[in-house]
């Protein structure tokens, strides 16, 4: 018996819609986005369980097996993100990103040079540090040197958001959606190379047009001294080795990549242990200073784990749990199958990118992955691209955009970003045309 036309189906759909309305208005009602979706996701499975108990074997009683498979998938992604976030927090605590910011501020560049510098650094930082971190870092730089100049700050912020999302689209580690596609085995590590040119085009078209409106002149050079703390370079090496280990587990050993990432967390744990026992002591001795246990902020890996953004991780859990329930009930097969059958793969995957600017791209990508679609590699590349860069169309369409809005709410608003939406859409279309050209050999 199908659950689609039962009270479980209707109630689950209603609860999912309510949860998403609360998520959309997170900033207005000051309710963390993880709270409604975690509750709703678990309630949906509660109702499914009650329904199966009431009807005995009529539905097959497969919820237990389905949830076990779902949790294995969620758990792998959860631990992967936990390690990545811990590394980013550790690098931040060691002043790696702050040192980069200080270096940029000291260069005394003109507004136009800063526009291109922040955009370029964001684009190439996103594949490693993720699009949210890179957008936050570069937007603080742009704001610091902007001197309140709205004509510079708004296009610079828009450029950073577009560059962050475009940069994250061509790497398994750049965005949660690309990570999901990669761990699902739909696009392998080296196959992401096909998305480099489309991602560059997606960023460069709006960046070039916006650069024509950047005011001439040069902001006052800021003298900010910020040195990296002891252990920063070792941690950066560990981060690179961790990514290599995660890729190797997935690509060559055919084991879940989160195991490689957890192995990398072990690298970081032993590095921090070394710094705690000997590194800081050597550093202070070199400076001719005495060690003061009360004053020294010792390298402690568990402090960085505590600082992980658990709201994001729990939101991720809630979304995947809720979408998994919709899949089990049968909604995804009907909605997804009908949409793709009616429009075709290319049109559907292009539309999904636009839709992801309105609704969070994580549930959209998870839904696509669970629709049992028989798409070839070129189409999986397209939906990976569009789901990653489509959020740039609106300021609230991506985590990077929402975070950057918090840097300067007075100037960078929803409407300020919307004014540049036609230009961003040109980049979106340009990236799809580029995708079509670079993947011709795959068809």
Model-derived segments and their meaning:
Residues 1-8, 29-34, 60-75, 189-198, ...:
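Interfacial loop-to-helix junctions that mark the boundaries of transmembrane helices
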Residues 3-15, 72-83, 126-135, 195-206, ...:
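Structural signature of hydrophobic alpha-helical transmembrane segments
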Residues 12-24, 40-49, 81-89, 121-123, ...:
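Hydrophobic core segments of alpha-helical transmembrane domains in multi-pass membrane transport
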Residues 13-86, 99-103, 107, 262-321, ...:
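Hydrophobic transmembrane alpha-helices of multi-pass solute/ion transporters
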Residues 58-154, 306-374:
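Membrane-embedded alpha-helical segments and adjacent helix-loop junctions characteristic
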Residues 133-144, 157-158, 171-185, 334-337, ...:
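Re-entrant/interfacial helical elements at transmembrane boundaries that shape
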Residues 193-199, 347-443:
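C-terminal transmembrane helix pair
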């Amino acid at each position: 018996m199908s659950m689609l036309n039962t009270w479980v189906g209707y109630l689950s759909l209603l609860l999912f819609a309510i949860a998403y309305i609360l998520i959309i208005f997170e900033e207005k009602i000051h309710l963390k986005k993880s709270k409604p979706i975690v509750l709703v996701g678990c309630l949906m499975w509660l109702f499914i369980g009650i329904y199966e108990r009431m009807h005995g074997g009529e539905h097959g009683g497969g919820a237990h097996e389905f949830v076990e498979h779902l949790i294995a998938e969620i758990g792998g992604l959860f631990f992967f993100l936990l390690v990545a976030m811990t590394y980013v927090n550790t690098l931040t605590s060691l002043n790696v990103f702050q040192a980069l910011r200080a270096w940029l501020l000291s260069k005394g560049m003109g507004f136009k040079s800063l526009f291109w510098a922040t955009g370029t650094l964001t684009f190439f930082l996103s594949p490693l540090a993720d699009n949210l971190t890179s957008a936050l870092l570069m937007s603080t730089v742009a704001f610091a040197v902007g001197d309140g100049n709205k004509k510079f700050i708004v296009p610079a912020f828009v450029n950073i958001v577009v560059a962050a999302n475009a940069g994250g689209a061509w790497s398994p580690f750049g965005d949660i959606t690309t990570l999901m596609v990669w761990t699902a085995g739909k696009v392998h590590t080296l196959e992401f190379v096909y998305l480099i040119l489309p991602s560059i085009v997606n960023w460069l078209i709006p960046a070039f047009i916006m650069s024509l409106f950047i005011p001439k002149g040069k902001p006052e050079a800021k003298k900010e001294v910020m040195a990296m703390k002891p252990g920063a370079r070792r941690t950066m090496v560990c981060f690179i080795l961790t990514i290599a280990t995660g890729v190797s587990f997935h690509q060559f050993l055919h084991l879940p990549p989160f195991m490689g990432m957890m192995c990398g967390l072990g690298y970081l744990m032993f590095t921090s242990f070394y710094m705690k026992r000997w590194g800081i002591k050597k550093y202070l001795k070199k400076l001719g200073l005495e060690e003061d246990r009360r004053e020294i902020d010792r390298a402690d890996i568990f402090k960085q784990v505590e600082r992980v953004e658990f709201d994001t991780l729990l939101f991720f859990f809630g979304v995947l749990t809720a979408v998994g329930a919709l899949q089990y009930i049968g909604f995804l097969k009907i909605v997804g199958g009908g949409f793709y059958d009616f429009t075709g793969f290319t049109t559907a995957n292009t539309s999904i990118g636009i839709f992801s600017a309105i609704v969070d791209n994580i549930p959209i990508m998870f839904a696509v992955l669970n629709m049992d679609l028989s798409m070839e590699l070129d189409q999986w590349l397209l939906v990976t691209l569009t789901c990653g860069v489509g959020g740039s169309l609106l300021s609230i369409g991506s985590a990077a955009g929402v975070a950057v809005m918090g840097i300067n709410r007075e100037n960078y608003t929803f409407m300020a970003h919307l004014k540049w939406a036609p230009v961003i859409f040109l980049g979106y279309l340009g990236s799809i045309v580029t995708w079509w050209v670079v993947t011709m050999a795959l068809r």
